[in-house]
């Protein structure tokens, strides 16, 4: 199992927010977690060609542009089999949302609001197979969606769609707060947790599984501090942390996190691509054969 968190360090354009793009290569299947820009998408295609993958599955943590905008390019290239995403137009979710909102609005109004808020997801239309990520499915061997918990997610969405309510959870927008989280079983038997821009309350139940953690919202330090405290309280020693952040203090940002001395093992994409789980080559030369000894 190899996970690669893309960096934009070597891109010529230093002003553009290229967003997140994370590849999960099981050795037999490829899963893409977010793709925020066409530049990242082009690198995904190059990786697939080199590794011999013709198709990949895609998990969309949420529909913000810095996580979504490279996806249409990949779909047009014909390499995406399924997109795991938030599909709130399903009747079972609409009924629950209306119930949470006290039937304050009619179903037709709710449908319009969902289509407006998640227009980029539904713009994918019939071009790719969309899979309901709220059912927390297994994507392939060793890769599964494990959060957010359904009721908590729908409560948050209802708050967002009800214009009488606020649009934040734990200081994050609802779009960010309910990001889909991914659990990956690494070759050492430990697990990695990908969080997108999730709010702390949404990732907290899943921290116990993880020895490798992508810090949410590009390393936003307020969330990182809570995660550090949570792991410390459970005496989880040796956890490794990763920050996908190519824009500094914008979009959450890791600059403040860098200036604080937390004494944690944190790696940043500002220093380049981050490979996780990549096997190191042996320093020893083996396997040579010089033939039989001539007498």
Task: Locate the predicted segments by residue.
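Binuclear metal-ion centers of metallo-dependent hydrolases, dominated by the metallo-beta-lactamase
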Residues: 81-146, 235-295
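Active-site environment of divalent metal-dependent phosphoester hydrolases
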Residues: 18, 38-40, 63-69, 90-93, ...
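Structural beta-sheet core signal
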Residues: 58, 193-194, 241-243
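Core dinuclear metal-dependent hydrolase active-site scaffold
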Residues: 1-53, 123-209, 220, 279-295
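Ser/Thr-centric signal marking residues that sit
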Residues: 26, 61, 198, 269-270
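Active-site metal-binding motif and surrounding structural segment of the metallo-beta-lactamase
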Residues: 39-90, 207-220, 234-239
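C-terminal or late-domain output modules
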Residues: 191, 203, 208-212, 221-233, ...
